[in-house]
A protein has these predicted regions:
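Acidic, metal/ion-coordinating pockets
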Residues: 1-251, 308-315
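Non-catalytic terminal accessory segments
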Residues: 144, 250-345
């Protein structure tokens, strides 16, 4: 939620986070009334100090059971974790007769252990990551011991193989199979589950919306879907258990003739929460940074060399050359990769 668009970069690199500032995405999440959240790999892109300043503005807890300060301990439950591994929140449910019951929900979070490679410059020497499934097997029994009626995994990990392997990046299926987890909210791979792209994948039932037999959902990316897990539960022998479930990834728009057509109305309060920073971001990206001697276009960006992509690559090459000047690496060849981020104008 911190990285991936101009606003994220503007806040991190230009405006910054002063004491008391609330990040616009956190402001929106506060407005929506989030009960809990976890960290994705991109939350680490701007460094730990920036991330901590952002999280301080949240009116809800963040949890993550597999990122530890310094070095890992001998056992997961001895790790000095960067964030609390889990939280137990009080909820109210109404039965078929209209009676209300108190329910304790255990919410535990996980992020891909590969962040140590992806953000090495920020994380090396400061934190270490533990295998997602290993952490879950250690902490889920503890959550049950503390009285959680149901345990839901908030897992920024994709849906990969059903066969467990240590330090899996996409560990949703082995994670869901951990005893004591009742449901899983997964992500990372920017797809939607249940959905046709996962038909026939071992460990999944797209029709039932289950991952390793547990209700699960993956809600696309960039707010493209709302993930819904609707549980039917019953109390038996003093304990709550899931008897059936329905999961759905509800899209917020549909594609009609190459256009996005909204399926829901915008919430004015959420728009207002981010309005000032949205407008500041627009003003920032609309500033002139230079002038070209020839017009640039991106009409053929997806099929051939393109001036709009080439100028980005040239700028990157120049910048790295400046950074390496006078160093032991100054004579090394520089390779620059640039992507066609837009086409047609």
């Amino acid at each position: 939620f911190l990285q991936g668009n101009p606003m994220g970069d503007y806040i991190a690199y230009e405006r910054g986070m002063k004491e008391g500032d609330v990040h616009p995405v956190i402001a929106a999440m506060n407005t929506l009334g989030y009960a809990c959240s976890t960290l994705g790999n991109h939350e680490f892109n701007y460094g730990l100090s920036f991330m901590d300043k952002v999280l301080a503005g949240a009116n809800f807890p963040f949890v993550c059971a597999n990122v530890a300060r310094g070095q890992l301990a001998a056992q997961p439950r001895a790790d000095d974790l960067w964030l609390p591994p889990y939280v137990i929140v009080d909820a109210q449910v109404t039965d078929g007769a209209g009676e209300t019951h108190a329910l304790k929900l255990g919410l535990i979070g996980f992020t891909p252990p590969q962040i140590m490679s992806w953000d090495k410059r920020h994380l090396e020497g400061n934190v270490e990551t533990r295998d997602i499934v290993e952490a879950a097997r250690a902490w889920v029994p503890r959550i049950r011991e503390e009285g959680a009626d149901l345990v839901i995994a908030l897992a920024h990990t994709g849906i990969g193989s059903d066969a467990y392997a240590p330090m899996m990046e996409n560990a949703a299926i082995p994670l869901a199979a951990v005893e004591g987890i009742d449901a899983i909210v997964t992500g990372h791979s920017h797809l939607d589950f249940p959905g046709p792209k996962y038909e026939g994948v071992a460990g999944l039932d797209v029709g039932k919306g289950t991952i390793a037999g547990k209700p699960g959902v993956m809600a696309g990316f960039w707010g493209s879907h709302m993930g819904l897990i609707d549980l039917m539960i019953e109390r038996e022998g003093g304990q709550w258990r899931v008897v059936s479930a329905q999961t759905e990834a509800r899209p917020i728009y549909e594609r009609v003739e190459r256009n996005n057509v909204p399926l829901v109305e915008s919430v004015a309060a959420v728009e207002e929460a981010a309005r000032a920073d949205h407008e500041a971001t627009l003003a920032y990206v609309r500033r002139a940074v230079g002038e070209t001697s020839a017009p640039l276009h991106s009409y053929f960006a997806l099929v051939a060399d393109d001036p709009s992509v080439q100028i980005v690559s040239n700028a990157q090459t120049w910048y790295i050359g400046q950074m390496l000047a006078g160093s032991e690496h100054a004579d090394l060849p520089i390779l620059s990769a640039a992507a066609p981020f837009k086409a047609g104008g």
